[in-house]
Amino acid sequence: MVFSIDTIDNETWANKDGDPRWRIEQHERWFHYIVDEIVPQIHHLAGERNWRQMPIMPFGCSMGAMHAANLFFRRPDLFDSVLALSGVYDSFDSFGDYMDDLVYRNSPYHYLSGMSEDHPYIRMYNERKIILCVGQGAWEDVLKESTSRIKGVLDAKGIHAWVDFWGYDVDHDWGWWYKQVEYYLPFLLGKR
């Protein structure tokens, strides 16, 4: 089953002229909509069709990659794996120097950096499949830097993730994301 859930990025992460506190409060509401309403509905629908609870994998490209990673890293109790393609995993690009409790809570680079090495989530992460991928071609520079930063944090915390940097011909574009999904999905589904 595939569920595609729209974001409110034009009001939140992409609304760089808006009040930062208001923007992140809206995003936090969206986050809770996903984990408090959508996830239980997915389990309900999957249970009706399959008579059992199904694993859930957040997946996204570009800004969706950040959302997928954030959902997974904040709630590994709800998600079994994550596929994030060409994402930014920190708040710098959208919020600049602004930081408060909610921005911190929604910036994987920040909250994973601050996570103690004996935090129970680290064991949970290591029991799941994590793939972060970025190209090194056109429009990927900021994303490549952010992916490098989060890779450093994941490595330092002992979090086993497949962080993959594709070639210099791999652009920030749908054609490449289709190829990456085709490449990674068998691994995530246990077919490889």
Feature locations, PLM:
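Non-catalytic cap/lid and distal C-terminal segments of serine-dependent acyl enzymes
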Residues: 1-192
